[in-house]
């Protein structure tokens, strides 16, 4: 579960460092991935934050591209697909809040599929 004590690289408590991995993911998570090499909890949250952040950006980008393409062909399809963007944002914010709360509690809460990838990369 959670490792106690202070982190070696940043000097932050592990739960605070884990929360910061999600604050501006994937950017902050990459920083903690490089700085906190010894703490497996922080490494897990850093990897999960990176994969979640990049994945969210990729999905939103893909929806926008598909919306533009279909909008050029059939305007109503572009508009319908364009409605997915706010729904994806809302879902991502809910998942982000859950990740932040669980990280603060010192829990390794795994996102489906992404959590297993993060655990593998973190060496857990």
Model-derived segments and their meaning:
Residues 17-35, 48-99:
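Hydrophobic alpha-helical transmembrane segments in multi-pass membrane proteins
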